[in-house]
Amino acid sequence: MSDSPIKYRLIKKEKHTGARLGEIITPHGTFPTPMFMPVGTQATVKTQSPEELKEMGSGIILSNTYHLWLRPGDELIARAGGLHKFMNWDQPILTDSGGFQVYSLADSRNITEEGVTFKNHLNGSKMFLSPEKAISIQNNLGSDIMMSFDECPQFYQPYDYVKKSIERTSRWAERGLKAHRRPHDQGLFGIVQGAGFEDLRRQSAHDLVSMDFPGYSIGGLAVGETHEEMNAVLDFTTQLLPENKPRYLMGVGAPDSLIDGVIRGVDMFDCVLPTRIARNGTCMTSQGRLVVKNAQFAEDFTPLDPECDCYTCKNYTRAYLRHLLKADETFGIRLTSYHNLYFLLNLMKQVRQAIMDDNLLEFREYFVEKYGYNKSGRNF
């Protein structure tokens, strides 16, 4: 697929780790890597405008195939001129395949070789999603980067189940490639699965790499395994993927996990974490996690994070944010969401600089100590 619309350019490798600085070229522009991608589930990053996302340095956003297929419908979005036009976002968009939502949200699902039958979580109607249908929906959405339809088994499933699952995922990937109608302007990634089993990850990666996708995703992590287990899987999985293609770790957004993923050679990450926790007043700051809704901040007239220069921190106090959230004012959620997204995008900017300076391990140590991971066990 040398004529793929998605190209990865390696700029520099970090001397002491597997980290790499690069950029990904897409039909809607180029973004630097490693990059965190804000999630716009329903064709919007909750409470944020496209202008704000650009302002905070978001070079690409993610949207969910499953949700947009159910509402408003992929054909309607195609009639609107595609997802970019529909949501007024002129930069790159990545869409997932819908697979993860089918396994996590839908009821009474039944997986066969053909695809997955499940109950729509909105109205209970029976639906069917196949590899071909997942590709067709994404072709209608017109995202720059698409995902193959895969099964995402739980991390602790038995070996025999996971083996059958990855073999089916490989067959589904092949079917998806054949069904792809727009390879000239949409790049399709294969998704490596295999839970915690090294030989199954190897088999899955081997199958997918032989199909020559423009990029590869690492799926089936951040689904309940420990941080150490995730790192162990990344240690052996990224090495199985080609150096000249992007590597995307799906569903990961905790700050230490982002840094540890980069150390192991990952280029792209996404997660709903920053906006989800912002809605209950939990904020990521340079000093660690802070729940601004707590009573101790009622008369705290300092910025949310004194070291942050985002719009929220430059203009509003902890006391004001607490007041807005306690009063259920949407503006409060907008401000905490803006800050959390900015925090992760800025973290990745610092990580890119650390790769440039060959001191990523020192940066990790400094960040982890300051954030308070060492004091309080894992948190986000």
From Swiss-Prot:
Pfam families associated with the record: TGT (PF01702)
Record-linked HAMAP family: Q_tRNA_Tgt
Region (RNA binding): 251-257, 275-279
GO MF annotation terms: metal ion binding; tRNA-guanosine(34) queuine transglycosylase activity
InterPro entries reported for this sequence: ArchSynthase1/Queuine_TRR (IPR050076), TGT (IPR004803), TGT-like_sf (IPR036511), tRNA_ribo_trans-like (IPR002616)
A biological process term (GO) from this entry: tRNA-guanine transglycosylation
Keyword Cell inner membrane assigned: no
Cofactor(s) this protein cannot do without: Zn(2+)
Function: Catalyzes the base-exchange of a guanine (G) residue with the queuine precursor 7-aminomethyl-7-deazaguanine (PreQ1) at position 34 (anticodon wobble position) in tRNAs with GU(N) anticodons (tRNA-Asp, -Asn, -His and -Tyr). Catalysis occurs through a double-displacement mechanism. The nucleophile active site attacks the C1' of nucleotide 34 to detach the guanine base from the RNA, forming a covalent enzyme-RNA intermediate. The proton acceptor active site deprotonates the incoming PreQ1, allowing a nucleophilic attack on the C1' of the ribose to form the product.
Catalytic machinery residues: 96, 270
Documented EC number(s): 2.4.2.29
Enzyme type, top EC level: transferase
PANTHER family given in the database record: QUEUINE TRNA-RIBOSYLTRANSFERASE
Binding, substrate: 96-100, 150, 193, 220
Upper lineage: Bacteria, Bacillati, Bacillota, Bacilli, Lactobacillales
Keywords: Glycosyltransferase, Metal-binding, Queuosine biosynthesis, Transferase, tRNA processing, Zinc
Protein's recorded name: Queuine tRNA-ribosyltransferase
Cofactor annotation remark: Binds 1 zinc ion per subunit.
One GO term describing the cellular component: cytosol
Catalytic activity entry: 7-aminomethyl-7-carbaguanine + guanosine(34) in tRNA = 7-aminomethyl-7-carbaguanosine(34) in tRNA + guanine
Name of the gene this protein is made from: tgt
Residues that bind Zn(2+): 308, 310, 313, 339
The family this protein is said to belong to: Belongs to the queuine tRNA-ribosyltransferase family.
Source organism: Streptococcus pneumoniae (strain Hungary19A-6)
Pathway annotation from the record: tRNA modification; tRNA-queuosine biosynthesis
